[in-house]
A protein has these predicted regions:
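Conserved class I S-adenosyl-L-methionine
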Residues: 2-48, 59-63, 67, 86, ...
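Conserved Class I S-adenosyl-L-methionine
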Residues: 3-4, 8-15, 30, 57-59, ...
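Class I SAM-dependent methyltransferase SAM/SAH-binding core
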Residues: 49-109, 133
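Conserved hydrophobic residues forming the short capping helix/wall of the S-adenosyl-L-methionine
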Residues: 68, 91, 168, 197, ...
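A short acidic, Gly/Pro-enriched loop at the edge of an enzyme's catalytic core
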Residues: 107-118
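A short SAM/SAH-binding and catalytic strip from SAM-dependent methyltransferases
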Residues: 117-131, 154
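Conserved catalytic/acceptor-binding region of the Class I
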Residues: 132-133, 139, 143, 147-218
């Protein structure tokens, strides 16, 4: 990884993990409002057995563990052992004894039928290889009438994305995302997430779109570095940027983000989709 602000980013896995550790406090602060929104939407109760899919570095699993109490339990599941270790460290720091991690694929869950009272995923379901299969597999491990609750990104056309990745796209053209690759906006179209939940056998399906706070507690330089570090779906586009264009892109990103900044924090706002269904 290079630290020069006008250089092309290094897209190695280690770089992303270093960035996750470097920005963990501020990233958690930025994501707190969407975590809170999903937790409130899910309505966890004391004693519940909860499964959080694509849990990454630990949210909303850690917040859910605080809500279900000592007689409840939360399992944080993800493909990345490294991110789950970050989640486990965060849970230990909070002395949560009702929290465990599980490295596994959401398409093949290592749990018996009827294991969980509640399932959640924050910004994860968009990246399932086969959402229908994953949702059916999740339904298998839910108990009768248990609820699955998801939060996904709304459209690309919103300040957080347009002010940074939109600037890059205007420079390089071509596809914003790699065809067939990970798509953060897979369920941005109204009704698309609820439709696939119904197809997977869920009942009482609901969906709504909300605009929530999405605020970075620091300067433009930080949020731009953090965005590049975690922007895996945009990597093919970012790799098309010629080396000599990066200084101009950095300048234009700063100009695009500045209207949302008060000098201490950057208030983008986030358009998200909340959806749920019952077994």
């Amino acid at each position: 990884m290079t630290s020069h602000p006008d250089s092309k980013p290094d897209w190695g896995t280690q770089y992303r993990l270093v960035a996750a550790e470097k920005w963990k406090t501020k990233s958690a602060a930025m994501g707190q409002s969407v975590t809170d929104a999903l937790v409130e939407y899910a309505q966890p109760a004391p004693g519940m057995q909860v499964l959080d899919l694509a849990s990454g570095s630990g949210e909303p699993a850690i917040s859910l563990a605080s809500r279900v109490g000592r007689h409840g339990h939360v399992t944080a599941l993800d493909l990345s052992a490294d991110l789950l270790e970050i989640a486990a460290k965060r849970a230990r720091a909070r002395e949560l004894n009702n929290f465990t991690t599980q490295q596994a694929d959401a398409h093949s869950l290592p749990f018996p039928d009827d294991s969980f009272d509640l399932a959640t995923s924050r910004f994860g379901v968009m990246f399932f290889r086969d959402p229908g299969l994953a949702f059916r597999e999740l339904r298998r491990v839910l108990r009768p009438a248990a609820r699955a609750c998801f939060l996904a990104w709304g459209p690309f056309d919103q300040p957080y994305w347009q002010s940074m990745m939109g600037v890059v796209h205007r420079h390089v053209g071509g596809p914003l995302l790699q065809p067939g690759g990970p798509d953060p906006f897979r369920f941005a179209a109204p009704g698309s997430l609820s439709e696939i939940l119904r197809s997977a056998g869920y009942n009482a399906v609901e969906e709504e779109t909300k605009t929530l706070p999405w605020t970075w507690p620091g300067p433009v330089e930080e949020v731009w570095e953090q965005a590049q570090a975690v922007a895996v779906p945009f990597r093919p586009m970012l790799e098309r940027v010629p080396e000599d264009q990066w200084p101009q892109i950095h300048a234009e990103v700063h100009a695009a983000v500045r209207p949302y900044s008060d000098g201490e924090k950057i208030a983008f706002g986030a358009s998200v989709v909340l959806a749920s269904g019952k077994k």
